[in-house]
Amino acid sequence: MNMGQLTQSMEREGSSRFVFLSRGLAFLARPSVAVWAAIPLRLIVGYGFMAHGFAKLSRGPEAFAAILHTIGVPAPHLMAWLTILTELTGGLAVLLGAFVPLVSLPMAAVLFVAMLTVHLPYGFSSIKLLSVTSGRAQFGPPGYELDLLYLACLAALVFGGSGPMAIDHYRRKK
């Protein structure tokens, strides 16, 4: 049964709310609307990477290098700077929709390293409720869920395009 048949069936049964909802959602699936889907992905992925890069930079690259050394990453000072630069420049590029397929590769590498060296031992979930004390929730270390979400968003942008209002979009038009 296709969407049209399902809608007609629901109309006959008197489910007007469903019909209104399905027609509203069908509007979102139109190609003229769907092209805009890349913009919220670009905004959250770009901002997220930049926020993490700025956090590492503000605490000092040496502090991040010490963490990398502790978990056994080779050349921790070099890798700290490469990670920070990847997060800042890659995040800005994704935010602007510039060279997204190119910058996604080092960004994905950062995510894979973080997932394998930090988050994997804590399982999938990004939220681990440990306890509630004095009316306050205490959470444990996050799992690899957010790494996978970021990777999925990057893949969607690479395979689906950066969307309108992106530097990549204007470069393709020329």
Task: For each feature predicted by the language model, list its residue ranges.
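Extended, low-polarity transmembrane helix blocks
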Residues: N2-S58, H77-L85, T89-L92, L96-K174
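Membrane-interface interhelical connector segments
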Residues: S58-L78
